[in-house]
Swiss-Prot record:
Annotated source species: Haemophilus influenzae (strain PittEE)
Superkingdom of this protein's organism: Bacteria
UniProt cross-references to HAMAP family, sorted A to Z: Glycerol_kin (MF_00186)
Record's signal peptide: none
Pathway: Polyol metabolism; glycerol degradation via glycerol kinase pathway; sn-glycerol 3-phosphate from glycerol: step 1/1
UniProt-listed GO biological process terms: glycerol catabolic process; glycerol metabolic process; glycerol-3-phosphate metabolic process
Chain sites annotated for binding sn-glycerol 3-phosphate: T14, R84, E85, Y136, D246
Binding residues annotated for glycerol, in chain numbering: R84, E85, Y136, D246, Q247
Protein's name according to its UniProt entry: Glycerol kinase
Amino acid sequence: MTDKKYIIALDQGTTSSRAVLLDHNANVVEIAQREFTQIYPRAGWVEHNPMEIWATQSSTLNEVVAKAGITSDEIAAIGITNQRETTIVWEKSTGTPVYNAIVWQCRRTADITDKLKADGHEEYIRNTTGLVVDPYFSGTKVKWILDNVEGAREKAERGELLFGTVDTWLVWKLTQGRVHVTDYTNASRTMLFNIHTKQWDDKMLEILNIPRSILPEVRNSSEIYGQTNIGGKGGVRIPVAGIAGDQQAALYGHLCVHAGQAKNTYGTGCFMLLHTGNKAITSKNGLLTTIACNAKGEPEYALEGSVFIAGASIQWLRDELKIVHDSFDSEYFAQKVTDSNGVYVVPAFTGLGAPYWDPYARGAIFGLSRGANCNHIVRATLQSIAYQTRDVLEAMQSDSGERLQYLRVDGGATNNNFLMQFQADILDVNVERPVVKEVTALGAAYLAGLATGFWKDLDELRDKARVERTFSPDSDNEKRERRYKGWKKAVKRSLEWAKEDEE
């Protein structure tokens, strides 16, 4: 395939659509990006226009080819990674959506999830789908559309409607309505999919009253699904050959494809995934059991956990406390002091997630003495991100019995060397920061490239997945455990704060 020089990853996110062009050495050659409209019809409701998602995504595909000055016959394949759970229902004959896309953040189906709990379905859903009962996932969103859009249920019963997450919608549009598929990673986020049998679950379809005919075919994350002439000139057709939900794509982009390998994405919050191989582990700590890819893009399993407030705590220092001017300053101020002087910041602004699951916890600063200053508070705030990561990873290790080999990292806060070094120290494992920061797009590109022979196997990619810097842990175990014990004490005192206040 010497004439094929490039792979394109379509990265369809919550606020923008991007196209990333990569060469055979997995270097980013060019990026095109377009934002699209966020629609908030009521408090707690979030929608996107599916046609605008498609318009922005298809235009970035054409734009990235034009900007790079390449021809479409040089493109080996297109891979797709996407915002997960976001739900689209459209007419099979026309391709017209019957309603806006209901976004993963949307809370409109809380009454449906409350009824699922009241009717005693929680344990079945947990054991079958790996998920907690929450409006976050696609199943209740599909039900809402069928129940609330005039004529939708009747059309669905007649087999005239199709459902898909964003990946399914993009493949449908790219192939001009010829292919209706999803991959295992996205299917596992719908609350309609049995992650053990790897089939759509009849009982869940019955509980939510969703006809089977609406569902896409579920395929591996690395295979050729169809061809597209979008982005192709002169009749050239490009294979669409890789799909993974954004967090699973990032896991694959880090080449975490074996049990015990983990990645953490540091954004507003943190998304952590620990690969568990062929074991679907039901968490005792409120983590999600989800599907991830093995080396060949076939379905295996992972545990997923999230920290609500990570990078957002640095924004708080900047915007509310005004003790840093921008996020980049935090590293400088944190290193103006040699330690946190006993100060702990618990950034529980919206409660605490795994493993505490306390919506009544609130933010607090502990351990203040007369000598504490703003630099200590900045340092303690950065440290809180690392402590929370340890909390989740300890839950993961407890559930899985796997000892973390190393932690691969991505996201904005990974540029903070102080935070990354402290993360290594508090976890007692190496923290590896990659050269290529577009890890989610890399994952989609790898899956597409392997499916089409652009890359031979994962061993070839390992040479390209270069680590920019490894942060090795401090060997002082006594200091590490003393610090972490202080953090646990601080968290304990912030729990149920708002609940006690109400009483």
